[in-house]
């Protein structure tokens, strides 16, 4: 019983000694938020990762934490690798629609050839996704589904019945 009382007193004293004032300013300013790295992607080789930085998308080694090279130069808001990591979808610009949805302008860079292709002729799209073979990218414009063949640049419309706040093809929505 004596040990329990001493332990309880110790915990109370430690709590008082290390107490911090919690304020709304600290909560909303991110004071208590953990530090992290945004825009990081682990590469399939298991030895490297990519990070978005001011100079572009930079490749680093896990083992040495040293820069291995720059995959794409320039400023981008975000990026996504194709499944085989042969291409990168680069988000250049965004325009919010609702709380979690946005329109964006995207380019696709072929990492082997260095060729850059603008998605949808440089116009805004939603939800772009690579095909499994990275030969095409599907996307949504005005609630209709499209895909673009990356080799030819040809854009094919899949649906035609999209309608704002009514028929929303290719985008998840609240019911």
Model-derived features: positions:
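Beta-propeller folds
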Residues: 17-175
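Sec-dependent N-terminal signal peptides
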Residues: 4-13
